[in-house]
C-alpha cells in the first residue's frame, strides 16, 4: 500500500516541528519538508514550482507570515506590507489550486513574545501584526475553501511563554514536538481518507 504524500511548506517554525509530525504520521503518510526555509510570502510564491517538483503531492500543508511581518525601524517598513502579504497568499493559493490536485491545509502564524524578541533583534515583531496578518490570510484561505490548522490558537492554549524560546519567536524543543503532534493530529484523518 502506498501512503499519501504530504509536503510541508513553511519557515523555521515548520522546520523544527516537521520531524515530530513526520514521525507521528509514519504509518499513514510519507511526509517531506521543503529543502529551505520558506521565508516570506514573496519567496514562497517564487519557489512553489521548485518545491512541488514533479507533483504527485496528495496534501500540501503551508504557512508563511513571520518573515513578512518583520518591521525595520530604520526603514519604517515591513518586510512585506500587509496588503502585499494578503495578495501573495491569494496567489499562492491560486497557484496550488491550479497546478495541483492536493488537499490544501493552511497553518496560522504562531505567536511572538515581543518584549523578548524585540530586546534581542535589530528588527521588530509585534503580536498585533501576527493577529492582523493571520486575519488577512484567513480571509483568503477560507474564501478559497482551504482547510485551516490553527497553530496560533494551539500555542496560546498551551501557554505562549511555555512554548516559545527566549528569542520570542522560535519554539522550545518541547514546543516544537507539541506543534508537530498537533499538525499530525490534524493531518492524520485527511491522510487516512486518501488511502
Question: Could you tell me what each predicted segment is?
Answer:
Residues 9, 34, 107:
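The conserved SAM/SAH-binding core of class I Rossmann-like methyltransferase domains
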Residues 2-19, 40, 69:
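Catalytic nucleophile-elbow at a beta strand-turn-alpha helix junction centered on a G-D-S/GDSL motif
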Residues 2, 24-30, 43-195:
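Alpha-helical cap/lid subdomain in secreted, periplasmic
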Residues 11-14, 37, 169, 176:
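Short beta->alpha junction loops/turns
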Residues 33-39:
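Short beta->alpha junction loops
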Amino acid at each position: 500500500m502506498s501512503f499519501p504524500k504530504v509536503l510541508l511548506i513553511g519557515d523555521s517554525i515548520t522546520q523544527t516541528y516537521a520531524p515530530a509530525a513526520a514521525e507521528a504520521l509514519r504509518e499513514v503518510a510519507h511526509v517531506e519538508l521543503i529543502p529551505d526555509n520558506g521565508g516570506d510570502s514573496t519567496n514562497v510564491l517564487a519557489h512553489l514550482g521548485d518545491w512541488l517538483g514533479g507533483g504527485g503531492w496528495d496534501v500540501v500543508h503551508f504557512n508563511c507570515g513571520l518573515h513578512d511581518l518583520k518591521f525595520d525601524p530604520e526603514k519604517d517598513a515591513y518586510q512585506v506590507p500587509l496588503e502585499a502579504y494578503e495578495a501573495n497568499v491569494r496567489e499562492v493559493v491560486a497557484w496550488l489550486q491550479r497546478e495541483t490536485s492536493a488537499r490544501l491545509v493552511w497553518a496560522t502564524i504562531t505567536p511572538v513574545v515581543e518584549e523578548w524578541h524585540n530586546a534581542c533583534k535589530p528588527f521588530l515583531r509585534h503580536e498585533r501584526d501576527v493577529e492582523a496578518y493571520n486575519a488577512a490570510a484567513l480571509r483568503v484561505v477560507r474564501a478559497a475553501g482551504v482547510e485551516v490548522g490553527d497553530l496560533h490558537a494551539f500555542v496560546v492554549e498551551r501557554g505562549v511563554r511555555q512554548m516559545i524560546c527566549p528569542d520570542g519567536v522560535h519554539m522550545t524543543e518541547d514546543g516544537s514536538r507539541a506543534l508537530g503532534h498537533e499538525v499530525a493530529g490534524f493531518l492524520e484523518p485527511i491522510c487516512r481518507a486518501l488511502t
